[in-house]
Curated annotation (Swiss-Prot):
One GO MF term: single-stranded DNA binding
InterPro entries: NA-bd_OB-fold, Phage_M13_G5P_DNA-bd
Top-level taxonomy: Viruses, Monodnaviria, Loebvirae, Hofneiviricota, Faserviricetes
Secretion signal span: none
SUPFAM superfamilies: Nucleic acid-binding proteins
Name of this chain's protein: DNA-Binding protein G5P
Family the entry assigns: Belongs to the inovirus G5P protein family.
Amino acid sequence: MLTVEIHDSQVSVKERSGVSQKSGKPYTIREQEAYIDLGGVYPALFNFNLEDGQQPYPAGKYRLHPASFKINNFGQVAVGRVLLESVK
């Protein structure tokens, strides 16, 4: 099980926006950061996208929901949209 931890200082949304060079349409990327325990000595800091209007996850411990994983075009397991489940 991959454990994700969000600290109080990470309960915020970072937004980046611009205009797509290909389509000319405006876009906004909403991200939150957290730490994930990959089994090493220290957890790794990572960013994950939030949906438009989605509130940031509160501080706490989580695990990746199984729906976060998908099979890509090459038949390999990959992480898609990150969905977190609270660990109690």
